Amino acid sequence: MLRSLVGSEMCIRDSFMAKSGFSGKNILINLIVTIVAGFIYFYVELPPINLHSAAFYSFFLFLSVVYCITAVITSGIYRQAENGKTFWKLLKGSCIVPLIVIGAVFVIYVVGGLLSSVVIRSGAYAKLITVETGDFTQDIEEISFDQIPMLDRDSAEKLGDRKLGELADMVSQFEVADNYTQINYKGRPVRVTPLRYGDIFKWLNNRSAGLPAYLIIDMVTQEVDVVRLPEGMHYTTAEHFSRNLYRHLRFQYPTYIFNEPTFEIDEEGTPYWVCPRIVKRIGLFGGTDIQGAVLVNAITGESQYYTDIPTWVDGVYSAEIIMDQYDYYGTYQGGFINSLFGQKNVTVTTEGYNYIAANDDVYVYTGVTSAGSDESNIGFILTNQRTKQTTFYSIAGAEEFSAMNSAEGVVQHLNYSATFPLLLNISNQPTYFMALKDYAGLVKMYAMVNVQQYNIVETGQTVAQCEENYRKTLLNNGIIDSTDAEVPAEEQELWEKK
């Protein structure tokens, strides 16, 4: 009788395994297909193996779905199932593990999202950034004309494309990449950008030598320098396969979440990719912040992770992360309920931003306005892109776009458009400085608008002329005295030589 019972049990088990496809051979096939598909997915999509990344959960869901689809095919349960109920029963028998994984991933994702929610963690979001207060006239020094960056990004791109067009040995094979990172290089505000391959065929022709040069655009003199490299850049965002920068990073740092890499050069002119490491400070998915950066040599591919960023690096914290963190700070200082009702002391950043070079670093500048979203600012912030040191300056005045409209109104007969302003200290007066462009995007004039009294606007064909006119207008309105109204002689002489 015992043998009969054992035999019956084995028959039932074999029958279930046959019906459900739960056999060693089928499982092996399912696993092989899933592993191959997973490797292809990982190679193409490059998800970080990190619980704080949504892409990681998508990767696991993809693997589970592939396994289930393969199991349905290899087991033949789609032929055996008489109805939906039977199909689901057989599917559970073949895919119990991946189905559990899908359920677990869903639960973790939902719970993690709730624990990261600003609704219940508003206080933590408000503490992501530390904001100090500063004095504008003491902290922001007047800078000489040869330090004022007159080029915006669009103008720099036009100059870069024009320069490449002059190089007969490069223009047929390469294009200018659209990085144009603003940095301080040897005490000068410049934008730097590498070349990229014109297309896949030009990549095939030139990949062994790499990208031969990068461009430096001086934002003051508007000069473009093509820096030819003794050895080409082999690791860039324009590369393919293992030399693609994103793939190179992922296989070297599989658990790191990276922000968008930026192209920079050190003081010797060696090209690097600065790859900020993203961490989540709040729950699983909330409180995006930066914790160090990986520096990748664009020529050799050598990389190193730094928690203490070298001083020559300028861009670690992106403007978007800085503005998001300040918006959390300004919005949730009084709690989540206050951000919706009452909105006492609730402030947010304005829509635009710009960069200011100071003390061999690059700072993000943006205005701060009240939650009412009127056309005036209550002040502005400056944030060091390398250290995230943030200072708020309480200066009530015109919002940047209002200042742009004021400048455009002065030259409305010419139909010029204003660039997003740069904040300067002119005679201890916070002043918006901007270029005025024609319909073709060429800079034709310059304008200065007083932040606190944006009806005070002056323009000029040159920066020197613009500032001279602006100082005279400040004098005529009793804002400054005659001593401050004069442009320093050494600066006047400098620009006359130019």
Model-assigned labels for residue ranges:
Residues M1-D14:
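Single conserved hydrophobic/aromatic residue that forms the stacking wall/gate
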Residues S20-K498:
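Soluble extracytoplasmic regions of secretory-pathway and membrane proteins
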